UniProtKB/Swiss-Prot annotation:
Tetramer of two alpha and two beta subunits. One of its GO terms (cellular component) is phenylalanine-tRNA ligase complex. Its EC number is 6.1.1.20. InterPro entries: aa-tRNA-synth_II/BPL/LPL, B3/B4_tRNA-bd, DNA-bd_dom_put_sf, Phe-tRNA-ligase_IIc_bsu, Phe-tRNA-synth_IIc_bsu_arc_euk, Phe-tRNA_synthase-like_B3/B4, Phe_tRNA_ligase_beta2_arc, PheRS_beta_core. This is Phenylalanine--tRNA ligase beta subunit. It holds the Pfam family B5. NCBIfam families: pheT_arch.
Length: 584
């Protein structure tokens, strides 16, 4: 869970509620879902909160939530923006990091507390949305130290996001006194050593230039020339990454935080060259993008989830107190609400998120629990007992137990496993393990999580990929959820628990995996047969069906070299996967 350090005096200042003592603030924060974890050495609150509320990674974001809670603010608030007449020209940027966004914020009251909060927000966003800067990285610069390439009335000022030769480009990085090349930064600068691996394999590294020269080497480090201090009043914000949506929303969160400090947000144009990689080639984007999103939720569903009766005026009122705007409308299911979501709320992806906000505005403490009329006696489900027994057996066979995400994406689930996606219909057998039609996420929060996995072996392969620096052998197993579309099910989705295991070692073979599988079958008194089969993820002639008590339930074999190469594995891997219920 994310933890943010917040000065209670700053909360009182930013909310305008100087009368609130520390205990009152803690109670109010708890009602918002922020739990007090303790004090820092600087007498600040340590607050833990749900990882989806990334807009609360700063004291400004926490204060905004409190102002809504107190009723001082209502509904969606959009900062007033002007055009800054600045353009980010995007040309010859690295294909591996093709996207950029930005904004200008003027007139800030930048004291020490504000600067510390900005730095904390920057690093927290790097660690969360930015995936340790791999997916998105933020650069904040003193605007007065930049010089645009053009100062004509027609075109305004511009800077350039491009690529540079890591051994030729030079600049003075932060915390340094002499010019260095990007290669030297990655080799000898402390920050460069930490984040240089993100671009070390690039032929040309990301670089941002103004008329003076290189001033940012994203995602590694900024230049000293544009360093921000407490004397800075006007800031230029740039963000680069592998996904435009991610960096745009990171930018929104930062801009809202700075606007809370009195900053005036100004828009910049992001102009992509005609030959730029990605879907924005030849396009000019106006950023930051403060467009609101609209979600629809029905009145019946709100009452059903919260367990209370509300009239329409109350729903609209609670939505506004949660920082949303709700308009009553009609749907096929009766009264509904079109709810506008502010641009910093990246967590709202489903009507249930709206209902959760309404419930918090109502006050979950005000909800009265009701007891069921029927008395029941609880007990463990047989499936749970079976799962624990299978897990104990796998551990006894020398496997390390894993717990992976059930959500993944089509590239990991299919392509990197040498499987074509089901819609490709290129001859893959419909009964191939892992080849079910996937359950897709309608509005995915991240491109990494767009489907429910159809099998667990790809998850294990990703763990092996991320642990090539560890010693071998690595024998890993997981019992977890897999799912696929199935019209015969009432929900249209068939879910099952699956058992997957892999042996990564110098002598890994089909025979090794078969011996472990046989021992597992014997432990559950199951008759095991392994007739030969073919599967794209396994080597031809070294794969077989897993047949337990006469029913085909899985596959076993040696992983195909293509799959090993995709996962940067240099040792052979033998693996199996089958349905857990076959052990019942």
């Amino acid at each position: 869970m994310p933890v943010v350090d917040v000065d209670p005096d700053e909360l009182r200042y930013l909310t305008g509620h100087s009368e609130k003592d520390d205990d009152e603030l803690k109670s109010d924060l708890f009602n918002l879902g922020l739990e007090f974890e303790g004090w820092t050495e600087d007498d600040e609150f340590q607050l833990e909160f749900a990882p989806d509320r990334l807009d609360r990674l700063s004291v400004e974001g926490v204060a905004r939530s409190l102002r809504y809670h107190y009723g001082d603010d209502r509904g969606v608030e959009i900062p007033n923006t002007n055009s800054a007449d600045w353009t980010i020209e995007v040309e010859d940027q690295p294909d591996e990091r093709p996207y950029v966004t930005g904004a200008i914020v003027r007139g800030l009251d930048m004291d020490e507390a504000a600067l510390e909060s900005l730095i904390q927000l920057q690093e927290k966003l790097h660690a969360t949305m930015g995936r340790k800067r791999a997916k998105g990285a933020i650069g904040v610069h003193d605007l007065t130290m930049l010089k645009g390439d053009s100062v004509t009335d027609e075109t305004g000022k511009s800077i350039t996001y491009t690529s540079a030769d890591p051994d030729e480009a030079t600049f003075v990085p932060l915390d340094a006194d002499a010019e260095m090349t990007p290669s030297e930064v990655m080799a000898s600068h402390e920050t460069g050593q930490t984040y240089g691996d993100l671009v070390a394999d690039f032929d040309r590294v990301p670089a941002i230039y103004d008329a003076i020269g290189l001033f940012s080497f994203p995602p590694v480090i900024n230049g000293r020339r544009t360093e921000v201090s407490v004397d800075s009043r006007d800031l230029f914000i740039e963000m680069t990454g592998t996904n435009q949506w991610t960096i745009d929303h990171m930018c929104n969160i930062v801009c809202y935080a700075l606007a809370a400090r009195g900053g005036q947000v100004e828009k910049v144009d992001v102009s992509y060259a005609d030959d730029a990689p990605g879907e924005y080639a030849g396009k000019t984007l106006e950023r930051p993008d403060f467009s609101v999103r609209t979600k629809t939720v029905t009145h019946d569903r709100i009452e059903s989830i919260l367990g209370v009766s509300l009239d329409s005026r109350e729903v609209v009122d609670y939505a506004e107190r949660a920082g949303l705007d709700a308009t009553e409308t009609e749907s096929d299911d009766g009264v509904a609400y079109d709810v506008e979501v502010p641009p910093y709320r990246v967590d709202v992806i489903h009507p249930l998120d709206i209902i959760d906000d309404i419930g918090r505005a109502l006050g979950f403490n005000s909800l009265e629990p009701t007891y069921p009329d029927v008395s029941t006696v609880g007990g463990r489900h047989e499936r749970s007992r079976l799962e624990d027994a299978a897990r104990d057996a796998l551990v006894g066979l020398g496997f390390e137990d894993l717990l992976n995400f059930h959500m993944t994406n089509e590239v990991e689930n299919f392509e990197r496993m040498n499987l074509s996606t089901p819609e490709a219909e290129d001859g893959n057998d419909a009964d191939t393990v892992g080849l079910a039609d996937p359950v897709t996420i309608q509005e995915p929060y991240s491109e990494d999580y767009t489907i429910l996995r159809t099998w667990a072996l790809p998850s294990i392969m990703m763990v092996l990929e991320n642990n090539t620096h560890r010693s071998y052998p690595q024998d890993l197993a997981e019992i977890g959820l897999a799912a696929g579309l199935d019209d015969s099910e009432n929900t249209g989705v068939a879910e099952h628990r699956t058992v997957a295991a892999a042996l990564a070692r110098t002598d890994a073979s089909y025979e090794d995996a078969k011996a472990r599988l046989q021992a597992l079958a014997d432990a559950f008194d199951k008759d095991l047969e392994t007739p030969p089969t073919t599967h794209p993820s396994f080597i031809g002639g070294r794969a077989a069906e897993v047949v337990l008590d006469g029913e085909s339930v899985g596959v076993i074999g040696e992983i195909h070299p293509k799959v090993l190469v995709e996962h940067d594995l240099e040792l052979p891997v033998a693996a199996f996967e089958f349905r857990l219920d076959a052990l019942a």
